[in-house]
Amino acid sequence: MDSNTITSFQDILQRMSKMQLESSSVDLNGMITQFERLKIYRDSLGESVMRMGDLHSLQSRNATWREELSQKFEEIRWLIAECRNILTKTENSFEQITFLQALQLLLEVESEIRTFSFQLI
């Protein structure tokens, strides 16, 4: 994984963990958990592309893998919608910057996951 992406994930997660949004903290904790799982999934896909042995095992369980990939794209869309929702409601510049960066990162990660998945198909 690109070191800038790692830093971006860590930075956003750290800043989100310090926030108290007007909405419930459960929603924010859910977003943080989703971000962490997305990072792990993105890392594992990138590593799979690097190792040809994994390519064959992924192809052998293709139906499960495609379903998992579909779920990750749903999670990304949900996170994007949540970031946009928070951006429309907040007037706090710290929150705006954090969620704009989170939105940008989500779009980059979505693109990377698509690229990895096309290489694995």
Swiss-Prot record:
Its main location: virion. GO terms for cellular component: host cell nucleus; virion component. One of its GO terms (biological process) is exit of virus from host cell nucleus through nuclear pore. A motif (Nuclear export signal) lies at residues 12-21, 85-94. It is found in: Virion; Host nucleus. The keyword Nucleotide-binding does not apply. The keyword Transport applies. Keywords: Host nucleus, Host-virus interaction, Transport, Virion. It holds the Pfam family Flu_NS2. Mediates the nuclear export of encapsidated genomic RNAs (ribonucleoproteins, RNPs). Acts as an adapter between viral RNPs complexes and the nuclear export machinery of the cell. Possesses no intrinsic RNA-binding activity, but includes a C-terminal M1-binding domain. This domain is believed to allow recognition of RNPs bound to the protein M1. Average number present in a viral particle is estimated to be 130-200 molecules. Belongs to the influenza viruses NEP family. Interacts with protein M1. May interact with host nucleoporin RAB/HRB and exportin XPO1/CRM1. This is Nuclear export protein.
